[in-house]
C-alpha cells in the first residue's frame, strides 16, 4: 500500500532573527540565559516539549534563550559505517528551530577534540565559562562528555560549583510509547509516514538539490526529478504520493524510492514524477 511522503526541494532558509553561532563565542546579550542541549534530530514533539519549557523559563526571568546542538550527529561521528541516519538535514533543523523564535543557536563541531572533553570539562568550559548559562534544559536520557559518562546526575552534582540550575524534561509519550528520534527513524524505515507526521507535528520532508539524470524517463513519457538521499534515513522502498516544493513552484507528484528499478541502476534515489 502506498503511504504519503512529503519531499520538499527548496532553497529558502527560515532562520530569520535567530543568531547562529558556529563557535561558542557568544555576544554579551546572549550570555547568562536559558539553554537547551541536544541533537534535536527531527525536532519532534518530545524536543518541542523541551524547547517550550525552556522558553517559558526564559520569558519568566526575562533572559535570552538558546539551543546547543552538535554537527555531525555524534552517532555518525563515532560510527563511520552509519551513512543514512538523519531525520532532518542541518538546514532543516535550523529552520525548524527558528520557528520557535529562539534567540540563538550554537552548533558545536563534534570532532576529536570535543569528544575528548570529560563531563566536568564540558560543564566548566561550555556551560560556565563560554555561555554562563543560568538554567539548563535537557531530556531525561541526556548523556555527554568523554565516553558518554556524563548524565543528569552529573549535571545536578556541579550546579553550585558552576552556578547554574539544571531542569530535566520528562519524556513525552504517545500511546504509552516514548517519542524519540530512534523510534521515528524506525518508523521511517517501515514507511509509516502518517504516524511520523503526527510525532513531528508536521509533514516529514526530504530536502536537497535536484541532480541531473540521464533523461531516459522523459523519453518514455515519465519525466522525473531525481534527488539523492545523502545522509537521510532511508524510508521503506516503494512508491509514495508526494508534494514537491521548488524555488518557484509547489506541486503534487508520485515518488519512487529505490535503485532505479526500470534500468537496473545501483544508486539509491528518490525519483519524482511531478504532475502538471
Which residue stretches match the model-derived regions?
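N-terminal catalytic cores of NTP/NDP-binding nucleotidyl/phosphoryl-transfer enzymes
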Residues: 25-84, 89
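Active-site-proximal cofactor/substrate-binding loop regions of enzyme domains
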Residues: 67-79, 84-127
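Residue-level signal for inorganic ion chemistry
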Residues: 44, 97, 136, 196, ...
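Phosphate/ribose-recognition catalytic cores of enzymes acting on nucleotide-derived substrates
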Residues: 211-276
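N-terminal amphipathic/basic-hydrophobic helices that include classical n-h-c signal peptides
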Residues: 1-17
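Classical nucleotidyltransferase
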Residues: 116-223
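Short acidic-hydrophobic, aromatic-tinged amphipathic segments that line or gate anion-handling sites
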Residues: 19-25, 106
Amino acid at each position: 500500500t502506498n503511504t504519503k511522503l512529503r519531499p520538499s526541494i527548496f532553497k529558502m532558509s527560515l532562520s530569520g532573527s535567530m543568531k547562529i553561532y558556529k563557535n561558542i563565542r557568544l555576544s554579551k546579550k546572549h550570555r547568562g540565559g536559558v539553554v537547551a542541549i541536544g541533537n534535536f534530530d527531527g525536532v519532534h514533539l518530545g524536543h518541542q516539549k523541551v524547547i517550550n519549557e525552556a522558553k517559558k523559563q526564559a520569558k519568566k526571568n526575562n533572559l535570552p534563550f538558546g539551543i546547543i546542538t552538535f554537527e555531525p550527529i555524534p552517532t555518525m561521528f563515532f560510527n563511520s559505517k552509519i551513512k543514512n541516519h538523519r531525520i532532518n538535514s542541518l538546514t532543516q533543523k535550523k529552520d525548524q528551530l527558528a520557528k520557535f523564535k529562539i534567540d540563538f543557536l550554537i552548533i558545536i563541531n563534534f570532532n576529536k577534540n570535543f569528544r575528548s572533553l570529560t563531563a566536568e570539562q564540558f560543564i566548566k568550559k561550555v556551560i560556565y565559562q563560554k555561555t554562563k548559562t543560568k538554567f539548563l534544559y535537557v531530556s531525561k536520557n541526556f548523556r555527554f562528555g568523554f565516553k558518554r559518562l556524563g548524565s543528569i546526575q552529573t549535571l545536578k552534582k556541579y550546579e553550585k560549583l558552576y552556578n547554574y540550575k539544571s531542569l530535566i524534561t520528562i519524556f513525552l509519550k504517545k500511546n504509552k510509547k516514548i517519542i524519540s528520534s530512534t523510534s521515528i527513524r524506525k518508523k521511517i524505515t517501515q514507511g509509516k509516514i502518517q504516524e511520523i507526521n503526527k510525532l513531528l507535528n508536521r509533514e516529514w520532508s526530504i530536502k536537497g538539490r535536484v541532480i541531473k539524470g540521464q533523461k531516459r524517463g522523459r523519453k518514455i513519457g515519465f519525466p522525473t526529478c531525481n534527488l539523492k538521499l545523502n545522509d537521510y534515513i532511508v524510508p521503506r522502498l516503494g512508491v509514495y504520493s508526494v508534494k514537491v516544493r521548488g524555488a518557484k513552484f509547489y506541486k503534487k507528484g508520485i515518488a519512487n524510492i529505490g535503485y532505479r528499478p526500470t534500468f537496473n541502476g545501483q544508486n539509491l534515489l528518490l525519483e519524482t514524477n511531478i504532475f502538471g
